């Protein structure tokens, strides 16, 4: 292992932001970039009237609706560290894409709307993080508005999300009376002033909770703050780094992302406490981040990041070694060597050629159709990284087009969108219509919009009488052939060439499983594994 690789790995922090829709996640992403100096001015999320859009929301449908649908990747430097920030889709229909992004990070920042508390999508996403014991930092947002009681919010996080809370800052008031926060570990009070353009050095600081200046500044609030802090210190958990790294305890910060308040404390905590890249599971062995040889896996494919170029980019998480532009690397699933000369790094949809990258970094490989989600790359060693699943879709539509002459464009568009993971595409073994599967209705809207904008195809989706899908496999090829013959009307091939059973209802699926005990019905499948 070289000292250079070890030093670079220690400098890396790779994290995702997770939240329920409208908790302020995209605003927070903007402000983190602003505070790090990566951008000069924050775009206004949902800025339909001003025409300003968030830096991380770039697809047409996102600009129209003010939601993050695709996951953006942004790299920036802060305090001598390289930070890779993955902005995940906040809309609940995109849990599958979000899950895949969470396989590529080492920690997560959870944003909670303090007026609403823990919401459904937050629960789902935290459960995904828990599968990998991902360390979580929590930000209670929107204290410039009327919000719920802060102690109640902590109790709710502990009860519902089953993770212990350690408050690091504590709010002084809320809404019109929001005065700032007290930093418990530093014994400092940061004074709040409204306004979205302020940078960290522009907020006032008072040292010490017993400083006489506090009585003069806010005589009504200071005694309440002291009482609350006494209560919090008696009733809450102290911050413990080992428990945080094990995913058992979350440090909690309070603030207002839209006013840039509380942002620097979060950034500092991610640099000081969040883990550097960790070893990764592959089928043959664990792969350490400081190993000399390059390796990585694809967790996302995005079509048409630049509609002018009709391109597709495969997002690769570097797991070990050092990537250098022009190096030879092996695409292991198809056993093909590629020269990595046009690999890029990201600042949302602004791209630059990547000269080098280390474990934790995200690089983009131009994809002409050969790369799939879950594929592994190395300098030659046969590694297959694990833990990137497809989920059985819950909603289904059949697809037809208004102009039959555009069938080729439809097929190409759906194949690309299917590989990207925006939607699952099934080709029934009998019947001409393609079937789309998704985990939420918005995915169909996104596909309709992207087929029209990027492929010039007007598609019509009709409801399909399918309740659920299961991938099927059997070691006995003869029995599998019998099963295929007997159930041809319910079988389809997915974009990865895997056989799937499309069940019209729960009873049908149960009966079919009983009749065919040798056939295995899978609710998930690994991306890189053909059943």
From Swiss-Prot:
Pfam families: EF-G_D2, GTP_EFTU, RF3_C. It is found in: Cytoplasm. Belongs to the TRAFAC class translation factor GTPase superfamily. Classic translation factor GTPase family. PrfC subfamily. GO terms for biological process: regulation of translational termination. One of its GO terms (cellular component) is cytosol. GTP binds at residues 19-26, 87-91, 141-144. Disulfide bonds: none annotated. PROSITE patterns: G_TR_1, G_TR_2. InterPro entries: EF-G-like_DII, EFG_III/V, G_TR_CS, P-loop_NTPase, PrfC, RF3_C, RF3_dom_3_sf, RF3_GTP-bd. Residues 10-278 form the tr-type G domain. PANTHER family: PEPTIDE CHAIN RELEASE FACTOR RF3. Keywords: Cytoplasm, GTP-binding, Nucleotide-binding, Protein biosynthesis. This is Peptide chain release factor 3. Increases the formation of ribosomal termination complexes and stimulates activities of RF-1 and RF-2. It binds guanine nucleotides and has strong preference for UGA stop codons. It may interact directly with the ribosome. The stimulation of RF-1 and RF-2 is significantly reduced by GTP and GDP, but not by GMP. One of its GO terms (molecular function) is GTPase activity.
